[in-house]
Amino acid sequence: MYEDDIRRIALINAYQHEGKADLKSVMGKVMAEIPDLRRDPRSAREMVSRIVDEVNSMSAYEIRETVETRYTSSIRKEKKVEEHRLPDLEGVNGPVVMRMAPSPSGPLHIGHTRMAILNDEYVKRYGGELILRIEDTNPKNIDPDAYHMIPEDLEWLGVNVTKIVIQSDRFDLYYAEAKKLMENGHMYVCTCPREEFKKRKLESIPCKDRDNPPETNLELFDKMIDGTIKEGDAVAVVKTDLKHPNPSVRDWIAFRIIEARHPRVDDKYRVYPMMSFSVAVDDHYLGLTHVLRGKDQLTNTDKQRYIFDYNGWKKPYYYHYGMIKFPGIKLKTSLMKKGILSGQYEGWSDIRLGTVRAFAKRGYRPETFRRYWINSGLREIDAIFSIEIFDSINREIVDPRAYRFSFVKDPVPVRIEGMPNISAKLPLHPTHPEYGFREYEVKGSVYIASRDFAAISEGERIRLKDLCYIRKKGNGIIYDGVEMTEKTKIINWCPEGSRDFSVLKPDGSKDSGLIEPKSSGYRGIAQLERYGYVNFADGDDLAYFTHP
């Protein structure tokens, strides 16, 4: 009498907990919803335990399909809506000016998206400017294509860039600021051998050039620029505190000579600013009000404060969020580039990579990135990226528009003895009948996965999804009607006329089989029933795996 209600509660619980119903939680909800069962709690527990075991024997795909088909209204009622909002920024008295500052070593990867989206969210909240500053001050680590790939990635993410600044256009400004600091005694040119300079810093001993007069430093700096001084023979250094507890902050190098062609400005410059110097100068002249950055930049923030203090500049508000680990995701640009050049990867959008382009090709949506990083917020604690949560967000976004199709991996043909001709009418979406149907005339022959076929026991009743029931008899399969008389295992099938089809997966593997004819011409995200979500991006015969 109550089994249907108990099964509904158990299925929804499993749906909400990654495919496994929790007996204690289900029991509590059953007792709350069905007061009559409280009269005999022992019998009730036995019934609930049996049904929970049945539900937990189902695959995650079966559970999701059943719940989303039968209990949509229930899960909408039970779904906890948790609003996430980024904390307010300090010192906001009007529009803000914020920035993203990637290096042009390649396109953006998933790690960059946090910085981009958090900055974008705050500029949307307060109004103002969001500057894309491309930091190309290391000529040996530049991919020329990155100058257009980075803006393209941001546009796809829905990040509204109001201005693009490229640091290789600003060297004259950096040189002028360096000379001003030298004139005021805050910078000097060091000609010590590299190892000697490093050793002196560690021992808090000043370099022999530290107290040179401004005119000497200015002359040496000009010789660095005009080529008189060779690479490795001199660096320009910002004076700080030689007793600073962090040796990296003590008298840090602000400029070095690099004899390498710059992909964008060729050989126009040979003296290149270090990141902390160019960043401090740009943050001031671009009017930055707030800076969001990872905790790995705390030391650089300390360095940059010296530039602000020496010049009497107003410092922006700094926020340092915790670091995120991305287990199993390839993010190191140099290794990705090496793999592309060697032919290991097909390009920056190869789905084995962690680039924004690869995630887009697999079928992830821009809103997924935004919701994930807003939920993560600006917390200072380190964390591990959860692909499960990321997938769950994307699934919620794409599912309402994802057509359903049947894909049979490693198919075997099955002739069903005694089966009449059946007109199969399968919905393109279980909760959106307005999308239409996939209709087939089935005349006793279908394809099923070899794994499913091998798992059918003698005499076992199996349901071919949305078609009919079958049983195994000896070496054959016989028709067993269309009426549901008991709970049975459900397997997928494809009709005659299905075509060859493959799914490429992010681990580099490929699943091959047959896909039903009605998928022809479809583009975008689809759910291959009892398999997972895929993106049809490159024709009818291939899709990219998105997630379960």
Swiss-Prot record:
Reactions listed under catalytic activity: tRNA(Glu) + L-glutamate + ATP = L-glutamyl-tRNA(Glu) + AMP + diphosphate
Entry superkingdom: Archaea
CDD domains xref list: GluRS_non_core
Enzyme class: ligase
GO biological process entries: amide biosynthetic process; glutamyl-tRNA aminoacylation
EC number annotated for this UniProt entry: 6.1.1.17
Main location: cytoplasm
Keywords from the UniProt entry: Aminoacyl-tRNA synthetase, ATP-binding, Cytoplasm, Ligase, Nucleotide-binding, Protein biosynthesis
PROSITE patterns found in the cross-reference section: AA_TRNA_LIGASE_I
Chain ranges for the short sequence motif 'HIGH' region as given in the UniProt record: 102-112
InterPro entries: aa-tRNA-synth_I_CS, Gln/Glu-tRNA_Ligase, Glu-tRNA-synth_arc/euk, Glu/Gln-tRNA-synth, Glu/Gln-tRNA-synth_Ib_cat-dom, Glu/Gln-tRNA-synth_Ib_codon-bd, Rbsml_bL25/Gln-tRNA_synth_N, Ribosomal_bL25/Gln-tRNA_synth
Similarity section: Belongs to the class-I aminoacyl-tRNA synthetase family. Glutamate--tRNA ligase type 2 subfamily.
This protein's name: Glutamate--tRNA ligase
